[in-house]
């Protein structure tokens, strides 16, 4: 029975897809195949298609099968980081003279990749408010090969109607790439809504424990999958076996973790909306969020990420970050522990002076799975 027919239920797929019992010992958890090369049965006689671990490794294969099943795709590819996955994708899709549309609130690392690296390839790019399909359409050119979307976006929690933007992109002959890092496949499945490629930083919710760095691409198009696999092997920025094992462990509990992240975040967002020092709360679960209806349509729940703006400007926002005690001041997101950061000085510093620059008074929360009362109390004392 193939993985996609184990069950239609996400929680069951997360535990069983790609997790075949070890044929030698019966171990229910796939081993960490910490190996670089494989014995051949005669010249070219490969066992299971394995010859060199840059090309393929059984532990990585298990993870890639798991990721494909969870996103409803036919091919998953695991990389050494989310940016390594982005780099492979861009090298596969684009050449000199091509054009890409990216969000006007993209992740700082993605912006840096386009601004400092991709532009040197002779590739053109422009920004658009992807929450507005007409703005995406206006940004298209005859050379556009891809439209890039984050939803929810990092760090402004913007929401893009995936199905609507997919239609706009496809009408122009472009592919739609969706960064699904904030939502995860448990909350949102972009391929089912018309996306061509789903991107993940596995470092975040998929790993879920702040102990691994990784990235992934998932597609349904077999030809595109083969092209990506060729570039993955040619470039070599693959996920190692132990990293693959850590993420595979993480995906098993993804559903229960995301339920708790979302539950805690909803309560925290509600508290922040009523706090006198908070001027704005950015969380798609709030009815007043401009993307709430779209998010409710395409997401199972609203996730664990919140951003908010603080009265008093940049220094006040920094002070809130520094005063937190249960929330750890640090970059990244998606672990079981709650994190707080100042995007303008930390994760999104590379956007300063650009169209993607984030507000100086912005604070970003990655809400963990601790007792929510402790988190609420910590934020209240940090805000003063």
Protein language model features and the residues they cover:
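Conserved PLP-enzyme active-site core in the AAT-like
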Residues: 2-6, 16, 75-277, 282
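N-terminal "arm"/small-domain region of PLP-dependent enzymes with the aminotransferase-like
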Residues: 2-57, 63-66
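Positively charged, small/polar-rich N-terminal and surface patches that mediate targeting and assembly
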Residues: 2-7, 11, 58, 270, ...
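Conserved N-terminal alpha-helix of the aminotransferase class I/II PLP-enzyme fold
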Residues: 37-87, 109-116
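PLP-dependent enzyme catalytic core of the Aspartate aminotransferase-like
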Residues: 115, 124, 145, 322, ...
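A common structural junction motif
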Residues: 235-236, 323-332, 382-384
